[in-house]
């Protein structure tokens, strides 16, 4: 029997935090951000997040406030790797995006220590 996939399902982004070079914790997408991460049973991930409210932003800033990518994923222990097939961020295309993750029931934390952290909650209905 194959081990259960701890990420399988749809997850709503509840917060997205980034550390600046001086160690200050910021919320670059505001609170709350908007977005989802979907991990399907065929091994594909779809991630999209951005600002929930963009009415005060210029069209350029709106485009820069959105992060989206997809591709096949693999799990090794508490490490998630997404091989990015396409993204609105050119540097991600063809890259391996590696994140540590932790599950606590329907709560999921993904991130890179000292760089950023996203907190998500499983969508159940």
What is the meaning of each model-derived region?
Residues 1-125:
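Lipid interaction determinants
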């Amino acid at each position: 029997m194959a081990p259960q996939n701890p990420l399988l399902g749809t997850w709503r982004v509840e917060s997205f935090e980034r550390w600046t070079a001086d160690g200050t914790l910021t919320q670059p997408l505001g609170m709350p951000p908007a977005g989802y991460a979907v991990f399907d049973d065929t091994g594909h991930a779809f991630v999209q997040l951005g600002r929930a409210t963009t009415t005060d932003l210029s069209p350029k800033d709106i485009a820069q406030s959105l992060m989206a990518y997809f591709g096949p994923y693999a799990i090794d222990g508490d490490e998630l790797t997404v091989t990015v097939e396409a993204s609105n961020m050119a540097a991600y295309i063809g890259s391996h995006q590696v994140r540590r993750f932790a599950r606590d029931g329907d709560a999921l934390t993904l991130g890179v220590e000292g760089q950023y952290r996203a907190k998500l909650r499983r969508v159940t209905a």
